[in-house]
Amino acid sequence: MTSWNFVCLSLGSNLGNRHEHIRRAYASLKKAGIRNLKSSVILETKALLLEGAPKEWDLPYFNSVVIGETQLSPDELIEEIKMIESRFGQDASLKWGPRPIDIDVLFYGDEAFSYHSDKCTIPHPKVLERPFLLSMIASLCPYRRFRLEGSSCNGKTFAELAAIYPLTEEDALGSFGSATQIMGIVNITDNSISDTGLFLEARRAAAHAERLFAEGASIIDLGAQATNPRVKDLGSVEQEWERLEPVLRLLAERWGAAQQCPDVSIDTFRPEIIRRAVEVFPIRWINDVSGGSLEMAHLAKEFGLRLLINHSCSLPPRPDCVLSYEESPIEQMLRWGESQLEQFAQVGLDTSWQVVFDPGIGFGKTPVQSMLLMDGVKQFKRVLECPVLIGHSRKSCLSMLGRFNSNDRDWETIGCSVSLHDRGVDYLRVHQVEGNRRALAAAAWAGMFV
């Protein structure tokens, strides 16, 4: 029987949606049969460039380290890694150039294992030159020893190596939790409960989207029609498009040729808005607050988009139209989710990744029901077998914790975000990106989620 061997890999990305590329690479490694995978935090670092490299290659990297166990030999593992990289459109001829994903084998087997072929060298010959790697390795296996005959570091633990070659403030540009991505909210409306009227002007909305991306959002959700309980008139398609179109055109100018950019999501329940949007900007997500109509599912299939299905008992939500009090809200949402996913699978969507489930915190749920639904993330992921997003940011259910206006609930939002990350949520939709991103990274670094 083939034995299982320890493996330590580094993952890096400095093109496109870097956080999403790290996530996809991690999922691909699991599919390749690497078991018991654990990830470090993601650190953003400056690019390491050869002298004379083009200036346009100077793009910051997202880096993480993963450990696990594999039955593949070193050469077989390298071949698997090359296949994964090729699926990202990797140009192998650009050595040291920008890339959507770069996966290196750092260590393999027991501590004394060394290997050299035309495909790889183990231990990785550059590992001691990269303090950010040593820091991440030490967070996962601090007492494993570095073994390399002739090296002054031979026999030292990674905990000690991380102290000898410390990660400095200049080395780390930022940090991110590896498991959960953040969707930043841009409300292009005059009647939202939060940020109302702040981003009606297209240039302000586009600038806010850029700021949220800079703060750590890997997805930007643009909404030009409010659907909160205070809304009486949902307005027309033309009114919604009049607000959304100029923002999309500005972002197309700014991100169209950008080498690093987020995914863009459109928050709408109107298929016509999606049809118009794809003509203006290469959007990646549909955020359907109506729960995912079949027409929206067909659009997701046609254009290769991800479909976020947000449950709501009514549109706009009404206080007299909520989930049943006689049954667990989690069970009610599971039935609804299973029914929706079955329909979307028949349309041809891959529900394991293309459909994202959102139980709709505050949309036809009491504060207690919303609290219970946030506690149900693990059940949703286990039963539905699809990604889960929670949109709890500044919601009225948080008023149970104190009398704060909607724009002053970010502390409560962040506290819930940390708890949701611990439950394995895939995406968090929030207004205040930087605070959530920093809190999740700190919690991950402290060992809560690695």
Swiss-Prot record:
Keywords: ATP-binding, Folate biosynthesis, Kinase, Magnesium, Metal-binding, Multifunctional enzyme, Nucleotide-binding, Transferase. It comes from Chlamydia trachomatis serovar D (strain ATCC VR-885 / DSM 19411 / UW-3/Cx). Pathway: Cofactor biosynthesis; tetrahydrofolate biosynthesis; 2-amino-4-hydroxy-6-hydroxymethyl-7,8-dihydropteridine diphosphate from 7,8-dihydroneopterin triphosphate: step 4/4; Cofactor biosynthesis; tetrahydrofolate biosynthesis; 7,8-dihydrofolate from 2-amino-4-hydroxy-6-hydroxymethyl-7,8-dihydropteridine diphosphate and 4-aminobenzoate: step 1/2. InterPro entries: DHP_synth-like (IPR045031), DHP_synth_dom (IPR006390), Dihydropteroate_synth-like_sf (IPR011005), Hppk (IPR000550), Hppk_sf (IPR035907), Pterin-binding_dom (IPR000489). Its EC number is 2.7.6.3, 2.5.1.15. GO terms for biological process: folic acid biosynthetic process; tetrahydrofolate biosynthetic process. Mg(2+) binds at N187. Coiled coil: none annotated. It comes from the Bacteria. Residues 182-450 are annotated as: DHPS. This is Folate synthesis bifunctional protein.
